[in-house]
Amino acid sequence: MPLQEETLREVWASDSGHEEDCLSPEPPLRPKQRPAQGQKLRKKKPETPDSLESKPRKAGAGRRKHEEPPADSAEPRAAQTVYAKFLRDPEAKKRDPRENFLVARAPDLGGEENSEEDSDDDDNDDDEEEEEKKEGKKEKSSLPPKKAPKEREKKAKALGPRGDVGSPDAPRKPLRTKKKEVGEGTKLRKAKKKGPGETDKDPAGSPAALRKEFPAAMFLVGEGGAAEKGVKKKGPPKGSEEEKKEEEEEVEEEVASAVMKNSNQKGRAKGKGKKKVKEERASSPPVEVGEPREFVLQPAPQGRAVRCRLTRDKKGMDRGMYPSYFLHLDTEKKVFLLAGRKRKRSKTANYLISSDPTNLSRGGENFIGKLRSNLLGNRFTVFDNGQNPQRGGGGDVGSLRQELAAVVYETNVLGFRGPRRMTVIIPGMNSDNERVPIRPRNASDGLLVRWQNKTLESLIELHNKPPIWNEDSGSYTLNFQGRVTQASVKNFQIVHADDPDYIVLQFGRVAEDAFTLDYRYPLCALQAFAIALSSFDGKLACE
């Protein structure tokens, strides 16, 4: 038994010496141990006395070492310690402390990167200690994260604005406010620009509103022509209320006087449309005596439409090529107004218009006017029965013929099928409800030449109302208020650009040789009849 006791003492001595080595806090003994195969040594930072003092603070470190069973060799223990540090350090480095502190990431700013990295290293060391404390105590403490943001805010204030999105002192903030200010400025500018437009569209005081209320005002022109027009147009922008009131009063007086004067001596009669025409014609002398000549030259009564019916006569030897046309009032009595026929021996289309259906010659007493076209047949001029200035009629200006209207059909060179486009030029009306006389002494002073040169002094330009395509019927349609029943290329409506709802002239087919013709102020029967005749003539370049 003495051998066994000696061996036990040796074992006890070896065990006690090993325990003393494990309990000793001297670090230089650990680097001498070799790690296991497949693992690399981790370079250790030189430990300062602060780190040595901080090691005893780690709670539970000695207990874990006592609880672990003794290893057979020193190499496995060294591997375990190195492996533990290898696992612990990456976990701390992988975790971003900014996630706990909710600090926004600032853009890269060159010289400030070093200071930020140093602060991140300090945070990593603090996080390692916090994790170890959490493992030992198994409790989560939220106090350190609350203190850290305050410190960061102090540092950020000391360093100055970095352009952080979350910081209130970011330099981008004033740029955004500037943009908003610019936007507000543009809005104000737009409002300022819209200001004068809104004043121009004033429904109460603008001349356009008065023209819509009184359609006759659209056709009023002064004796001075464009000069007076220019003065009237320049008045509203000045902004003086007195001038506006004066203009309104003048327009109202002119319209009122025109209504009173343009009553055809029966303006007090009650009724509308056809009834008025009937009463006027019934109280007038018989048609054959010569009273129709005055009626067909007078403008239509204001506020009423004169409804007529136009018939075409193709019977006879030459009526197929040169038919005759007759205009009657569309009433029960069918009062005759005008007749027209195309002349045979003429280089261009030439229609003679008379107030006697039995005598359609130029030398007749009832000859009242004519319609003449150019060589292409797309431009027409309406004359009264005055003398031609080129044939010895230049002595007395009052005896020269007047140009009552001009019609221009837009050429269709490419041959596309579609509705016609018309432009009608007529003389304007003065304050006495009389037509401004246009008596050109040469060919360069007519309505068509003035229209081409855009010198529309004392003139009114009208256009046909564009029809609307109807997919159901597969044709172009216009609202004729039931006055037109058949489709035709000759159907049209003439309107003014200022008021497209005010139909000055309406023409359309109701039978093979019957058409309706309704006209309103400022047209007269002769003008309306001649414009309708121009649609019958063949047009080489318009169809």
UniProtKB/Swiss-Prot annotation:
Biased composition (Acidic residues): 110-132, 244-255
Gene Ontology molecular function: actin filament binding; phosphatidylinositol-4,5-bisphosphate binding
Membrane topology: Peripheral membrane protein
Composition skew (Basic residues), residue ranges: 267-276
Keyword Cell membrane: yes
Region of interest (Disordered), residue spans: 1-290
Tissue specificity field: Retina specific. Detected in the outer plexiform layer in photoreceptor cells (at protein level).
Disruption phenotype: Malformation of photoreceptor synapses, followed by photoreceptor degeneration.
Keyword list, A-Z: Cell membrane, Cytoplasm, Membrane, Phagocytosis, Secreted, Sensory transduction, Synapse, Vision
Compartment list: Cytoplasm; Cell membrane; Secreted; Synapse
Domain of life per record: Eukaryota
Listed GO CC annotations: axon terminus; cell projection; cytosol; extracellular region; photoreceptor inner segment; photoreceptor outer segment; plasma membrane; synapse
GO annotation terms (biological process): dendrite development; detection of light stimulus involved in visual perception; eye photoreceptor cell development; phagocytosis, recognition; photoreceptor cell maintenance; positive regulation of phagocytosis; protein localization to photoreceptor outer segment; retina development in camera-type eye
Basic and acidic residues biased stretches: 46-56, 86-99
Protein family: Belongs to the TUB family.
Protein purpose: Required for normal development of photoreceptor synapses. Required for normal photoreceptor function and for long-term survival of photoreceptor cells. Interacts with cytoskeleton proteins and may play a role in protein transport in photoreceptor cells. Binds lipids, especially phosphatidylinositol 3-phosphate, phosphatidylinositol 4-phosphate, phosphatidylinositol 5-phosphate, phosphatidylinositol 3,4-bisphosphate, phosphatidylinositol 4,5-bisphosphate, phosphatidylinositol 3,4,5-bisphosphate, phosphatidylserine and phosphatidic acid (in vitro).
Known partners and oligomeric status: Homodimer. May interact with ABCF1, PSIP1, ZEB1 and HMGB2 (Potential). Interacts with F-actin. Interacts with DNM1. Interacts with TUB. Interacts with TYRO3.
Descriptive protein name: Tubby-related protein 1
Organism: Mus musculus (Mouse)
Gene: Tulp1
